[in-house]
Amino acid sequence: RSSWLRVVGRLAPGTTYQMAAADLQSLSDALTYPERGDTEGILVTRDLLYRPSQTAQLTSLSKMLVAVVTIVLVIAAANFAVLLLSRATTRTREMSIRAAMGAGRARLIRQLLAESVLLGLAGCAVGVGLAYTLSDAAATLLPYGFATGFAPDLRVLAVALVLSVVTSAVAGLVPSLHAAGANVAGAISHRRTATGGSLVRDALVVSQMALSLVLVAGAVLFARSFWAARTQDLGFRADHRLILQVDLRSQGYTEAEGRAFLPGALTRLRNLPGVSRVATSRQIPFQGDWSTDLEPPPGALPNSEDGKIWIGLNAVSAEYFETMGVELVSGRSFDSGDIEGGTQVAVVNQRLAHILWPGEDPLGRSVSFGEDLGFQVVGVARDATYYALGEDPTTQMYVSVQQRYQPLVHFVIETAGPPADLAPVAQAALRQLDAELAFGWVATMDDVVADVTARYKVSAVLVGLFGGLALLLAVAGLYGVVSFLVARRTRDIGVRMALGAGRGRVAGEVLRGSLGLAATGAALGLVGAVMLRRFTASLLYQVEATDPWALIGASATLLAVAAAASFVPALRATRVDPVEAIRTE
């Protein structure tokens, strides 16, 4: 089912969707003429923003975004737990004294959990404020140029509140149990007691590193995917091309009037300053299709399930191939001699030539379908992308618009400068021929391609932003842990330095410990990234989900940032004064 016009309406007060749909159905019935096989009508739907293909892409994007946000939430929770665990270690003596004075373990745990939840609620308030502030900017990342309600509503606030409470409570549970279960005598006498806190802390740091590597690797993959989509050889030139669409039939032009209008329009556009070439075409890449099928001639290779040959069509003017930058492999383009009533000629692409006449020269051959008398092939054009990125090689036949008039016209203008700057001038030039001329849409070919690749750009930007945030959280957690351990081990470091340990050896031990955690996390993250390949493969374009360069680059980035984050605590450890450290202890 196809459509040529979409109308968006707002219901009047007191009018239900069912009432409006019934009225529109009556109007639809009045527009149908079954006696002549006319099936035009009105389709009423609430799904008014996006086409089905766009809805599917946005659904995939939404699922990916939910997964990415969930990973960031887990990293943030682990980071929060690490900080609380370090804080709980420093409060062990306080909790032990309170326990000695009669405070029950359950009461201590409740207090610590309450503190965790309050911190989580404070973070929730900051996050909600940022969400309101950045909602407009986030909406601009959506593809297809539609504005969707992005401002948080009460449902979003409720979910954020619940997640904050639950996450902060879960993250604070282990630190609370650790602090409330400290050895009373040892803590009061300042003796260091062996606990499992360090193991839990290390596990949390490793998990952050692993999850952040998954996101960083994903960011690299999506960035490469977007680059591949934007730099793919489409078989035509998109830069410096301006497109103006006009539907002459909907504006009351007869075929004779339309034929008379086009030459003058092309002349006016050619004479504009900054215009290099001008042509017309019925179809523009990525903007719908016009097709037919035919019975395969002897020796042909059918390309459809019903045994026929499916052919994409386009009616173009002379200079179309030069204007769009489509290379002619052999033969010629259309010229002024290809007139109405003359020998019907066509240019086929390489794929169609191979299907119709495998291994033979297509020039001079004839293509016939329906009631047409046949088209003589005068040229072969290079294959191009017509309908979707990554499509299988598609058949295409070009006919001369002078011989096969089409009222739907796309003026293709090659410009010397920025094409968008020429748009108002070109529209004004055409309105000198018809003051009431309406344009279906006006866009640069670069904009058309950008819309097609928007899903890959959005994926790259979002995963890149969240990957960077995840890496920042993980590295901050590692920095906090290393700094905490250096501070806790000040006496040990001082004693070792007093016994002759060099500063380089001390710094090396600190760096080895932190990089060991980072390397373990990176290894686990690589395993996770490989395991998730079947979920990410469908979202990538011409990039393998296990691309080794992406995984190596993500791992190197993680280790480099981890080393940088550990450098300051390691340097601080080398500046410990042995005498002062022992005296303070």
Feature-to-residue mapping (PLM):
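Mid-to-C-terminal secondary-structure elements
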Residues: 1-63, 136, 218, 222, ...
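Small-residue-rich transmembrane alpha-helices
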Residues: 43, 81, 116-184, 224, ...
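Alpha-helical transmembrane segments of integral membrane proteins
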Residues: 47-55, 83-110, 114, 134-253, ...
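Hydrophobic alpha-helical transmembrane segments of multi-pass inner-membrane transport and secretion
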Residues: 58-93, 170, 198-223, 456-491, ...
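Residue-level signature of transmembrane alpha-helical entry/exit and packing/kink sites
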Residues: 62-66, 107, 112, 152, ...
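Intracellular coupling helices
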Residues: 78-120, 181-192, 476-517, 572-583
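C-terminal transmembrane helical bundles of large multi-pass transporters
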Residues: 390, 429, 433-526, 537-541, ...
